[in-house]
Structures are given as C-alpha cells and as structure tokens.
C-alpha cells in the first residue's frame, strides 16, 4: 500500500532526515512514470517515451516505459540501472498537492516511508529553531519548477492533439525469443508530422517543440535496451 502523505511541517517533521538513495524502492513495481517535456532528451537516451490516454478525461500524458508488463520495472535494482532518473522519481518523498482548506493553493507534502526517512542520518529538513534548512529550500524550489513545467508539458501535448499527431498503436516486439505486444500506447505519427504545413513547423520551432518531438521518435530504439535488461533478469 502507498505510504501515507501528510503536509510537511516543523511540528510533525522537525526531527526527520532524508537519507538520499539511488535505490528508489517506491517505484519497484512501476511500469511507467510521467515525464515533463523538458526531460525528453535525457530520457530518450535510455528509455522509450510514449503517451498514455486517460480513459475518463481523454487527456494524454507522456511517460517513460520501464518494463514490458504491469508491475515490472527493469531499471530497479540495488542501484538504479540507468544514468538518468526521471524527475518525478527524484522528487520523492515530496510532492505538491492542493491544500484541503484552499484547493487553489498548493502545499508541500511528504510521503512517510521508512525507505528514505529517519531521525539520525541524512539531510535535516528543519533547524533546531524550526526553520527550513537550505536542503529543504532547494528541494522545494526544484519541485516548484517541476510543477510549473507540467503546465508547459500540457501545452505541448495539447498542440500535438490539436494537430492530430498522436495516434494509438500496438507495438509488436520480440523479447527473449518470444513475441510480445504492447497495447494502449500512443505515439506521434511521423508521416502526419512530416505532412504538416511549413507554418506549423515554424510554430513548433518557435515554441521549442521540435526537440522533444524528435527525442520521442528516437526513443523507440530504447525498446532494444529494455529487451536487454529483460534478458538479464530471466
């Protein structure tokens, strides 16, 4: 079960310390993790990037694929088995959530898990006087920037949808000599992309969309990387 999430405060968490780790036990069973557009290039060097559709809202979210099956993360191990770690994983155990008394106001919350929290080793969150430490301020600033970038990512995805570039596809793969299918994923249609008028390409260049688009397309090659990781686990 997910660890409980509580608003971060000096009263409840004044003695808490964060023990930095590249173990990332909280994503051991995560097959996919969401991405922001700013990390497409780094992610594409090691992981496939696809889009998943929310069946209730119809909205698309870019994600990194970490495994071939539900509950499988091939990058999970004693140490993370990739040079790049998606930002949403790195921000753990912190997150921003709407405040209960004011849903329009975001508040910093912490996932109370034994994996990274303790009272003796690591980075303190508060001083003896109950003030935020420099470490906590840095984590808050990074998370705030990430939150801002989620809106830029939504704008990027909305543009792709507006131009009808995202299409559902079934990928036929071969892993360990066995044929597999990945269903329910969506990709940018390269033929539709190349058929766009010049003014659309100029607009994408102006907005900085071309780089993440091509990073996504190139990331399809990383299914071979996933297959190699799968071979090592069987």
Language-model features: where?
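Short acidic/polar mixed-charge low-complexity motifs
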Residues: 56-59, 70-71, 178
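Short, basic/low-complexity N-terminal boundary segments at the transition from targeting/disordered tails
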Residues: 25-28, 66-78, 149-155
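Aromatic- and glycine-enriched beta-alpha-beta binding-site module
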Residues: 61-125
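A contiguous, surface-oriented mixed alpha/beta subdomain in the mid-to-C-terminal portion of proteins
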Residues: 96, 101-234
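Short, extreme N-terminal leader segments that mark the start of a protein/domain
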Residues: 1-65
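A short, compositionally biased
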Residues: 43-46, 90-91, 165-168
């Amino acid at each position: 079960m997910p660890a409980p999430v509580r608003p971060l405060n000096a009263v409840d968490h004044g003695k808490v310390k964060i023990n930095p780790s590249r173990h990332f036990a909280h994503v051991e069973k995560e097959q996919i993790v969401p991405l922001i557009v700013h990390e497409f290039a780094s992610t594409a060097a090691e992981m496939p990037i696809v889009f998943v559709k929310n069946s209730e809202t119809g909205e698309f979210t870019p994600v990194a694929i970490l495994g071939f099956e539900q509950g499988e993360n091939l990058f999970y191990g004693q140490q993370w088995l990739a040079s790049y770690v998606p930002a949403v994983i790195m921000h753990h155990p912190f997150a921003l959530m709407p405040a209960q008394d004011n849903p329009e106001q975001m508040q910093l919350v912490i996932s109370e898990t034994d994996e990274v929290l303790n009272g003796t080793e690591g980075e303190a969150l508060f001083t003896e006087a109950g003030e935020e430490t420099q470490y906590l301020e840095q984590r808050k600033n990074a998370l705030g920037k990430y939150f801002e970038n989620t809106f830029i990512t939504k704008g990027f995805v909305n543009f792709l949808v507006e131009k009808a570039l995202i299409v559902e596809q079934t990928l036929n793969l071969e892993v360990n000599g066995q044929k597999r299918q990945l269903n329910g994923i969506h990709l940018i249609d390269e033929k539709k992309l190349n058929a766009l008028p010049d003014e659309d390409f100029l607009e994408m260049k102006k907005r900085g969309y071309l780089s993440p688009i091509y990073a996504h397309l190139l990331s399809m090659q990383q299914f071979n990387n996933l297959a190699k990781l799968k071979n090592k686990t069987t």
